[in-house]
């Protein structure tokens, strides 16, 4: 359909799913599949839904440029989100950043759902200082101006748009490196790059799904299949996500200053 024009709707996870269940949209990209009840609702209205992965992204933790403590363990991330850690010097004794402010986009977002369901294994966030910044762009802006903040955001928001290779992050904030070991050091901590999603070194990775519920099997199906196809998977790669179906080659290079 080369003459087709799409009208994307950017919204939170709860609103997007409700629109799909009400058949106000027929294609929804999200970071989880259908629950049994949701599948039953759609089938009861006619269309048999189809769910398939199109890519992967990371949940990133970002801090203010002035904060030099940019390595953190998985255990400390969980402690922070559970409210067991409330000040920066509890994580880094030398830190002078004071109380930790945890910044999310909004309470209905897929990012928050992932944190609760996957990182905290179904337990609610209990951090004392939680800020809702409305959307992902606002999370970045809040962290940029708040020295004691830590933002939680999808990793593809962090790419330096001037770098066509997607190998650098924007330079107005710091992207934390996460370690699966008991002590985070530069050599054992990893930032949310596509290569580290692929080899398992980055711990907080989620699957991006296409959910199609189209009774006419028309344009929504065609576009979903396009995204899952070779050209669509190249587009996924260029956005900073890891394609789910494309063949990925990782090459090591040495850079001389």
Segments predicted by a language model, with ranges:
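Acidic, Gly/Pro-rich loop/turn segments at junctions of secondary structure
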Residues: 31-46, 59, 63-64
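Short, structured active-site "lid" loops
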Residues: 25-31
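Exported/periplasmic ABC-transporter solute-binding proteins
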Residues: 1-14, 18-25, 50-57, 62-257
């Amino acid at each position: 359909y080369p003459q087709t024009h799409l009208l994307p709707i950017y919204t939170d996870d709860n609103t997007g799913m409700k629109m799909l269940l009400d058949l106000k949209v027929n294609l929804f990209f999200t970071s989880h599949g259908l629950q049994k009840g949701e599948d039953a609702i759609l089938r009861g209205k006619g269309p048999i839904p189809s769910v398939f992965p199109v890519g992967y992204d990371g949940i990133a933790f970002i801090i203010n440029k002035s904060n030099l403590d940019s390595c953190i363990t998985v255990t400390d991330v969980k402690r922070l989100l559970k409210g067991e850690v409330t000040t920066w010097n509890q994580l880094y004794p030398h830190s002078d950043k004071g109380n930790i402010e945890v910044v999310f986009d909004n309470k209905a977002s897929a990012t928050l759902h992932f944190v609760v369901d996957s990182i905290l294994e179904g337990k609610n966030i209990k951090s004392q200082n939680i800020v809702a910044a409305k959307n992902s762009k606002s999370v970045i802006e809040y962290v940029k101006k708040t020295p004691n903040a830590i933002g939680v955001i999808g990793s593809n928001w962090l790419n330096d748009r001037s770098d066509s290779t997607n190998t650098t992050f924007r330079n107005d904030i710091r992207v934390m490196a996460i370690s699966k070991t008991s002590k985070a050091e530069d050599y054992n901590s990893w930032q949310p790059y596509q290569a580290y999603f692929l080899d398992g070194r980055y711990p907080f990775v989620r699957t991006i799904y296409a959910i199609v519920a189209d009774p006419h099997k028309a344009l929504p199906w065609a576009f979903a299949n396009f995204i899952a196809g070779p050209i669509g998977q190249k587009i996924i790669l260029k956005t900073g996500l890891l394609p789910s179906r494309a063949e990925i080659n990782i090459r090591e290079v040495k850079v001389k200053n």
